[in-house]
Amino acid sequence: MKPFSKLCDAADWSDPLFDRVIRVELAEEPRFHRKQWEFARILRTLEAHGLLNGTSHGLSMGGGDERLLYSVARRVGHLTVTDLYGAGSAWEGARTDDPDRAIKASAPFHVDSSRLTAMRMDMRSLEFGNGVFDFCYSSCAMEHIGEYEDFLAHLREVRRVLKDQGVYVLTTEFHYGDEVIPAPHNYYFSASFLDGLVAAAGFEARGGVDGALSPHVFNRPIPANLRDLLPDAADAVTGRLLDSTPHVQLLTGGRPFTSLCLVLTKAAHGASAGIRPIADLEASREFIDEGVRRWKAFVERSPLNLDPFVAECGHTRGVPRLVAASESSPLFHTGYVWLGGVTRAVTIDFDAWPAAGSGAEAELRVHRHPDLRPDEVACAGSIRVPIHARERLRRQLQIDADDRCSYAVLARVTRGACWIDDMRVQVTIP
């Protein structure tokens, strides 16, 4: 029998049991998206362990108002839902000062509200007694809570509040490489890091992890920020097509990752803890690496049109924008994209004119960061552009792209204030 802990695999959507969970328990149409996979995998695992029995008591952590919690709540005795709820939360699903009322009011289908309680709580410090829950679960939440000591504190707290035979089902970000990627507020975990972390917390993934991937085209990695490469992503047709694009194996920069489901139980005294073995992982890495090479070859020979306003969510396209000199407010800012390892020409093309007749100046820049250290941002090139009157400006920077890094194009006003309109950013082969 294969272990319940496993990597996200496009072939999972062909499993009739998995399909039933999506259609019946989640009440959704199947789509190749790893978030749906996470929800369905957690449900399927809890079901297979006999924990969706109408009497069990469970704990959800970091779930906001996710659909999954309602699917679980209607099949257990009681589900306690926790998150860092608050009106100022950066997460839309957790943006409430009255989580119990808000969560119960947000149910996408009928759920007996007496089976559900929501409260604000830090998953590193669970305010419950010892051994009170039959199961706990979290869906891609742990990677957001900090660093190693935070992850360890969380797992130890879960171990404490679980009954001796309890199960913790979690999904998280899995990097196929040997390194951990400590992105701000979002870690991508390696196999060895998770193995050591789980062992240190006194947990084991009984039977190891199924690391096999089917040779399916939807298992070829694509950029997680694919929308950043499409300036017209807000267009109805483009947006609809993007919503149908597989979101299974992904790239952050040039680094491949996916979702991993771990099914953890308390390690017996003297038993080997951790998540090993991970069956067929090396074969899966070879398949994924071939997909990365294919994407790299495509990117290196293709012109790329970048969305200039990824970092400016409040900007309305087609409306002129007034920006004053500021260190913190960019004129525009693309997302960080992987360009492979060849020389690239970056062309910025836009209408600009000074505000109130005064002169202005803008600085156009290309920034980069190593994919393994996304917090280490450096300037890869810049040019200053004086703005004296209304005109169409076209400037070009040339960079030697490093395939270990990702790049963003941005600008800021360095003097005065100016209007901009019809901004276009293109990356080509010079």
What positions do the PLM features span?
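Conserved Class I S-adenosyl-L-methionine
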Residues: 179-214
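Conserved class I S-adenosyl-L-methionine
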Residues: 52-64
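A short acidic, Gly/Pro-enriched loop at the edge of an enzyme's catalytic core
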Residues: 121-136
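Class I SAM-dependent methyltransferase SAM/SAH-binding core
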Residues: 59, 66-125
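A short glycine-rich, Lys/Arg-flanked "PGG" loop and its adjoining helix->strand segment in the class I
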Residues: 150-164
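Extra-cytoplasmic beta-strand recognition segments
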Residues: 334-362, 393-397, 401, 407-411, ...
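Short carbohydrate-recognition loop motifs
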Residues: 309-330
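Conserved beta-strand signature within the Rossmann-like core of class I S-adenosyl-L-methionine
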Residues: 165-173
